[in-house]
Amino acid sequence: MVTPMSVLAPFLAGLCLVALPVSTHSVQPEPDRGVWRTAAPAPTKRTEVAAATLNGKIYVVGGFEQPGLGNLLNLAITASVQEYDPSTDRWTTKASMPVGLHHVGIGVTGGRLYVIGGYTQSGLTVWHPVATVYAYDPATDSWAERATMPTARGALSVTVHEGKLYAIGGYDRNANSAAVEVYDPERNAWTSRAPLPTPRDHLASATAAGKVYAIGGRVNGDYRRNLSVMELYDPVTNRWARAADLPTARSGITAAEVGGRIYVFGGEGGGGTFRENEAYDPVRDTWQTMAPMPTGRHGLGSAVVQGRIHVLSGGPTPGGSFSDLNEVFTPPGERMTKEG
């Protein structure tokens, strides 16, 4: 978790199957746990970002930048938006958000990118929760404000199901929110749905097999109180149910869906940051440990292009740390599909 002091501290301180010649035992191949590679780093080091894919390009928005003289007045909160093109391995700076935000929710539908909630600066605090919704149009490289979310909160998670954006959980700096509020871009209107059974913040969410999943997180902003709980929501019945727990209790995580499976990356806890990469199969309700991240991080974002998951930015150590990392995970089967 980033605190004002941790942000300002720099200022204040001045498969291989081996064939044996003869054997009476069969040799089992190593399970395919996916592979990692490194892509072009982002132009700036950041943490507590959000990321999403739109029209084959990846957008990284908001968060905290490394403190410097240029961002002292806004306590290092950034409104910047950076676009990454995997086909060229290059970054481009796009139109900034109307206001600097961190710990936002993000989703893409109808050809636009939506940034929902989060925290912003108010006086000397960087933890003022907001209910704002901003829509980005890549055709005009511009932002527009949309109908505000009913519940102001940050450290929430957003996922998309059938063209609607589900804003789940979060923290208003007093208590965890159980709010599940659904935004319909066509109507520019919000609807409240059944509350999250386990209120939490710094969670991840994803949509798979027609269900919405709320994964991990923490209690009242305290990463020493990480959760492994995962709950699934059925939009048809408007009911929540318990699913198999995340193997590693963690928060400050990110999740992405590829090939019907949900991959959960990173996070932080009292002992440091996590390299864990765990995959959930909604058909079997089971988890599998995948190849760990090259660099453990929290406050990171993820986005998928052509079956590959880009895991972006975030802090390598708990609290106020920053990175420009762009590490790319290819899940099992995707390498064969895309490259072979």
Describe each model-derived feature in a short phrase.
Residues M1-F11:
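Bacterial N-terminal signal peptides that target proteins for export
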Residues V22-G340:
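Kelch-like beta-propeller repeat domains
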Residues A9-A19:
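Bacterial N-terminal signal peptides
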Residues T3, G14, V22-T24:
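Residue-level detector of alpha-helical transmembrane segments in integral membrane proteins
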